[in-house]
Curated annotation (Swiss-Prot):
Region spans: Involved in Mg(2+) ion dislocation from EF-Tu: 80-83
Key words, A-Z: Cytoplasm, Elongation factor, Protein biosynthesis
Entries under HAMAP family matching the protein: EF_Ts
Gene3D superfamilies: 1.10.286.20, DNA helicase RuvA subunit, C-terminal domain, Elongation factor Ts, dimerisation domain
Name assigned to this protein: Elongation factor Ts
Cellular-component GO terms for this entry: cytoplasm
Entry annotated with the keyword Transmembrane: no
Family statement drawn from the similarity comment of this UniProt entry: Belongs to the EF-Ts family.
UniProt xrefs under InterPro entries: EF-Ts_dimer_sf (IPR036402), Transl_elong_EFTs/EF1B (IPR001816), Transl_elong_EFTs/EF1B_dimer (IPR014039), Transl_elong_Ts_CS (IPR018101), UBA-like_sf (IPR009060)
Gene Ontology MF, one: translation elongation factor activity
Length: 294
């Protein structure tokens, strides 16, 4: 009997995207023969899982879970909006976000290795891929714990917000809704990332220079643009979405509430969606059919 090493299991998993335990079982059954192990997995899991797992996932949902002072925010991706409404997919996501809150996995790989319904999360995921025919993958998550109170808000299933706060629950919930609507990038002006300010300054300098005004006026125009930008993207300085006569900071002060931090996930942000060329796809299928009959 050939010795089955971790490297062999990793290689087979990379080729097939099958769960690690299934890869180990297949290699054991094949006595270490990689090609034979791949064949065993194709028979056992079908071709769906391996093919689907290589496709781009830019749709999906965001889910939240709160249990006392512990909470979790999770994004799980799939390929189409249709599957994001599938009951089995929704149940899988719900199970995963609860695991994040309860088990505190270090990263997505650790989440996939956690036990779920007698299997690992990755094994359940692979079976779901085979059943639905689309790639499914937890993309990112954040776990919250500590002395702060938590409130979450979901705008449909595509935008999820978790807010850490002290004070009034209703005011904090309103802020969570505001964040989903106005999408601030930082809590205060001082928290806006330096690289974001640098990019905005570069744009402002170029626009101001085109005005043809004296350098001292151009400098004031640039600083004015930067201050306007900082107010627009910092939560506390934004105009409150439910009352345009006050800022979020003013609303919170009146409610004796303090926001300690927030996190917002938007499904698919930063993922380049696959653009299908239907004509090219048909041509490829015709060419493949011609080769098969030649």
């Amino acid at each position: 009997m050939a010795a089955i090493t971790a490297a062999m299991v990793g290689e087979l998993r990379a080729k097939t995207d099958a769960p690690m335990m299934e890869c180990k079982k297949a290699l054991t059954e094949a006595d270490g023969d990689m090609a034979r192990a791949e064949e065993i997995l194709r028979v056992k899991l079908g071709s769906k899982a391996g093919k689907a797992a290589s496709r781009v996932t830019a749709e999906g949902i965001v889910a939240t879970a709160i249990n006392g002072s512990t909470g979790a925010l999770l994004e799980v991706n799939c390929e189409t909006d249709f599957v994001s409404k599938n009951d089995d997919f929704l149940a899988f996501v719900n199970d995963c976000v609860k695991l994040v809150a309860e088990k505190n996995p270090a990263d997505v790989a650790a989440l996939l290795a956690l036990p779920l319904n007698g299997q690992t999360v990755d094994e359940v995921r692979s079976a779901l891929i085979g059943k639905i025919g689309e790639n499914i993958m937890p993309r990112r998550f954040k776990r919250f714990t500590g002395s702060n109170k938590l409130v979450s808000y979901l705008h449909g299933t595509r935008i999820g917000v978790m807010v850490e706060f002290e004070g009034d629950d209703t005011a904090a919930k309103d802020v969570a809704m505001h964040i989903a609507a106005m999408k601030p990038v930082a809590l205060s002006m001082a928290d806006v990332p330096a690289e974001s300010i640098a990019i905005e300054r570069s744009v402002a300098v170029q626009k101001a220079a085109e005005s043809g005004k004296p350098p001292e006026i151009v400098e004031k125009m640039v600083e004015g643009s930067i201050q306007k930008y900082l107010k627009e993207v910092s939560l506390l300085n934004q105009t409150f979405v439910k009352n345009d006569k006050q800022t979020v900071e003013q609303m919170l002060k009146a409610a004796n509430t303090t926001i300690k931090g927030f996190t917002m996930y938007v499904v698919g942000e930063g993922i380049e969606k696959r653009q299908d060329d239907f004509a090219a796809e048909v041509a490829a299928q015709v060419a493949a059919a011609s080769k098969a009959t030649a």
